[in-house]
Amino acid sequence: MADMFLEKFQSLVPRYLEDEWQPEDGLPADILTEELDTAGVDIPLVLREFYLALGGCEDLMEAYYYFFDPDELAIEDGYLLFLEDEEEEYVWGIRADQLDVPDPMVFRRLNARGTWKSEEGTFSEYVLDMFAWVFEELEPELEN
């Protein structure tokens, strides 16, 4: 299957870090497979390509919110958890019954209540919007 999302995720390095994408910005496919085997989870195509493109890029993997390393992925409450905020108030996930969808919808859980709410977008939409918010809106505010 052709890469559907890889180039779009790779393009985030020059857009937000003002540097060319390098292979070390992503995780090698064999390492990703090994870490997913350790976690014991399957992931959607979009998340696989996200890790292949950016899994080694700490500046993006930990840009305000923290993406879980592949070996830390877990299914909880019927969702594959992949992201948390710095205060650990929220966690983001993909419904476990949607992992075969190439680009599934993203949901957010308020940890204090344990309630899930749709983010009204797919993983690729959510991630691209999140990085735009972090680097184009939030970061300039924090610098002032």
What do these predicted regions represent?
Residues 1-109, 138-142:
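A surface-exposed partner-binding patch
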Residues 106-137:
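Compact, glycine/acidic-enriched structural inserts
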